Amino acid sequence: MLQAYKYRIYPTDEQKVLFAKTFGCCRFVYNWALNMKITAYNERKETLGNVYLTNLMKKELKAEHEWLTEVNSQSLQSALRNLDTAYTNFFRNTKAVGFPRYKSRKDRQSFLCPQHCRVDFSKNTITIPKAKDIPAVLHRKFRGIVKSVTISRTSSGRYFASVLV
């Protein structure tokens, strides 16, 4: 059984800049993919899969927008997976789920790091790709392997890390 632990983190100024870039890049990729899905369905009545969009993002989108290479690519891929899940949930014929919407800067900002994450209780730090040790308040210890870490920012400017074990 998977369990999540949410910790308050205190990133440095460099890490805050990296997080802001990652939030923006994930939002950009999500909105780009949603636009591609809507356009493909309206023009050709076809649906674009997650694998196709991931390959297109790696080849074409990163060539057009070089700033996408500054952030963790797995976080961008997880944004595409989130969109694919939202699309699948919409077409399941339940009335509880609406059509996926474009992401706004005003929405909750978060990104997922699915691999290469580490929590060090002796140093009170969390490590994710492209960001070295992030100071954190690790108030609760856990046992197990870290599956993923989700970094989020609240509207008041506080940062949190949700560790999935």
Predicted regions and their residues:
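Nucleic-acid substrate recognition interfaces
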Residues: 1-165
